[in-house]
């Protein structure tokens, strides 16, 4: 085992604070409407230009191991805030730096670190309550647009397109962000349920312009196994032919003789059929087939529940108003499923989301909810260069998370006003002893840090602005973009309550750990003494004349 270096007490904490300051100073320049850019070198390609706090934080790795530990702990603050609310990473970093700096001064002055931590936790809990009390519901499109605009560094076009996407697909809908191919941002909304499996044979195409197979008012047959024998399908095909309606088959696969017969029947016009593979794999495939069944009013033909294809009847088929199959996807519009069954299925999936610990599973389950209850919107980002596109995509992702958080827990006045207003309400808060009260005081003093940083980045005098805002009431604050004072909500400067809350909780939690640190352990730096110098090799003279 390699030898370790151990540092104790104040010497350890000061090294840790240096690391905290390096990371936080790099991140906090991005805060506010007049936040600056940070340029990050990449091992290949052009450098990355960003105003996203968590992107900056993730890139920082320091040479000194003790300083690096401090930086990594603040990085954890940014990641935690990002995981909970998807935004507020810079605010969380600024708060953590302020609490740690004040806290370590108090520890150096002889205060009890554990009591300081209790005081900080008490202050954070009181401020969180105040934020909840200040919060107003975010229901109308204009408020959603304003939240998106603020979170995208005051880019109103981003706010507008996110608000439109939310309006089109509803709160349950899934909105994804992709890199587009033009200069302008585009919004594409998918009606109905879409999954990423297309037609199994190009011979099913009946619309040559769009190269798609379109079925009007079709029956839908769902099977959770491969279909290779056409005899299994004959009873269903005969029933569908008599009803003179098209048929969509979704199965694990349709191959060989079965697929060939379906193609021939379609080309001759006997029965209009299209077939697609079921989406997903394994258990997820079964779940998604069940979703399609609920949406279309079908029964999944599965041997697990004692149903076989040979005995299937038209009653077990679903229906929809329209189905479109392209090479890559299948879209079912207006399935004839029972509304109560769809609602209960959505509730069931939501319960699974609540119980799931995997982010990937949660994302996939949320997509299923969207396909059943809402819709799917895709925002395609446009920009002049790839660099600008990457930077804009990061901002749109942030703005999207912020608007979701706003819809969830409402909005508060932005620009750091909510925290300043909360601390003026609980200025009389006291701890059980003097050290706890000091912890409360230093945490409340740190609540001003985000507003101070926004004002500094805008080139104004922080102390003057903070004092003036403290004297005001309600949503009165400072608009750093214009340099004016006024009602923040009326000026459209809003922050999601969830973002402000999670930033504060993450900062207080990690700052408390750092203040109560008494020893730090790291590997000793390796002594990289090179190989001894081999000296020059003698000349190879005297070899002339060798022809």
UniProtKB/Swiss-Prot annotation:
Complex and partners: Forms a cylinder of 14 subunits composed of two heptameric rings stacked back-to-back. Interacts with the co-chaperonin GroES.
GO CC terms, sorted: cytoplasm
Keyword entries, A-Z: ATP-binding, Chaperone, Cytoplasm, Isomerase, Nucleotide-binding
Record's function text: Together with its co-chaperonin GroES, plays an essential role in assisting protein folding. The GroEL-GroES system forms a nano-cage that allows encapsulation of the non-native substrate proteins and provides a physical environment optimized to promote and accelerate protein folding.
Protein's UniProt keywords contain Nucleotide-binding: yes
Compartment(s) where it occurs, according to its Swiss-Prot or TrEMBL record: Cytoplasm
UniProt-recorded Gene Ontology molecular function terms: ATP binding; ATP-dependent protein folding chaperone; isomerase activity; unfolded protein binding
Encoding gene (name): groEL
Annotated protein name in UniProt: Chaperonin GroEL
Catalytic function, reaction form: ATP + H2O + a folded polypeptide = ADP + phosphate + an unfolded polypeptide
Family under the similarity heading: Belongs to the chaperonin (HSP60) family.
InterPro entries listed in its UniProt record: Chaperonin_Cpn60_CS, Cpn60/GroEL, Cpn60/GroEL/TCP-1, GroEL-like_apical_dom_sf, GROEL-like_equatorial_sf, TCP-1-like_intermed_sf
Binding site for ATP: 30-33, 51, 87-91, 415, 479-481, 495
Key word ATP-binding present: yes
Single Gene Ontology BP annotation: protein refolding
EC number per UniProt: 5.6.1.7
Root EC class: isomerase
């Amino acid at each position: 085992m390699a030898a370790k270096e151990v540092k104790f007490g104040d010497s350890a904490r000061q090294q840790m604070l240096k690391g905290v300051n390096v990371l936080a100073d790099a991140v906090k320049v991005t805060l506010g409407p007049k936040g600056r850019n940070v340029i990050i070198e990449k091992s290949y390609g052009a450098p990355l230009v960003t105003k996203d706090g968590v992107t900056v934080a993730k890139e920082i790795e320091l040479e000194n191991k003790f300083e690096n530990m401090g930086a990594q702990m603040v990085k954890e603050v940014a990641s935690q805030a990002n995981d909970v609310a998807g935004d507020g990473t810079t605010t969380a970093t600024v708060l953590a730096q302020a609490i740690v700096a004040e806290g370590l001064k108090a520890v150096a002055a002889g205060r009890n670190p554990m009591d300081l931590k209790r005081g900080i936790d008490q202050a954070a809990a009181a401020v969180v309550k105040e934020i909840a009390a200040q919060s107003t519901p975010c229901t109308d499109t204009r408020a959603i647009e304003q939240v998106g605009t603020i979170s995208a560094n005051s880019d109103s076009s981003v706010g507008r397109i996110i608000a439109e996407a939310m309006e089109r697909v509803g709160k349950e809908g899934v909105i994804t962000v992709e890199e587009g191919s033009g200069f302008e941002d585009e919004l594409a909304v998918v009606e109905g349920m879409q999954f990423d499996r297309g037609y199994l044979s190009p011979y099913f195409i009946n619309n040559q312009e769009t190269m798609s197979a379109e079925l009007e008012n079709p029956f839908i047959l769902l099977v959770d196994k491969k279909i290779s024998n056409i005899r299994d399908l004959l009873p269903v095909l005969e029933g569908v032919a008599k009803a003179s309606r098209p048929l969509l088959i979704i199965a694990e696969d349709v191959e060989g003789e079965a697929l060939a017969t379906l193609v021939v029947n379609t080309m001759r016009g006997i029965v209009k059929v299209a077939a697609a593979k079921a989406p997903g794999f394994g258990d997820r495939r079964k779940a998604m087939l069940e979703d399609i069944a609920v949406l279309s009013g079908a029964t999944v033909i599965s041997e697990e529940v004692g149903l076989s294809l040979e005995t299937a009847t038209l009653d077990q088929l679903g229906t929809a108003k329209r189905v479109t199959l392209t090479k890559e996807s299948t879209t079912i519009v207006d399935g004839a499923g029972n509304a109560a069954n769809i609602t209960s299925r959505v509730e069931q999936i939501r319960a699974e989301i609540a119980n799931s610990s995997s982010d990937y599973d949660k994302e996939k389950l949320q997509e299923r909810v969207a396909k059943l209850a809402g819709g799917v919107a895709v925002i395609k980002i446009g920009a002049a260069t790839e660099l600008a596109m990457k930077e804009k995509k990061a901002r749109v992702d942030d703005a999207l998370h912020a608007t979701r958080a706003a819809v969830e827990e409402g909005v508060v006045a932005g620009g750091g006003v909510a925290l300043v207003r909360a601390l003026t309400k609980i200025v009389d808060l006291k701890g059980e002893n003097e050290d706890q009260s000091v912890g409360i005081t230093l945490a409340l003093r740190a609540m001003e840090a985000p507003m101070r940083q926004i004002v500094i980045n805008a080139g104004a005098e922080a102390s003057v602005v903070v004092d003036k805002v403290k004297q005001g009431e309600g949503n009165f604050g400072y608009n750093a973009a214009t340099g004016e004072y006024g009602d923040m909500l009326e000026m459209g400067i809003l922050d999601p309550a969830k973002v402000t809350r999670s930033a504060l909780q993450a900062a207080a939690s990690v700052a408390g750990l750092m203040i109560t640190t008494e020893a730090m352990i790291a590997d000793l730096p390796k002594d990289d003494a090179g190989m001894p110098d081999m000296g020059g090799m003698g000349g190879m003279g005297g070899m002339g004349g060798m022809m």
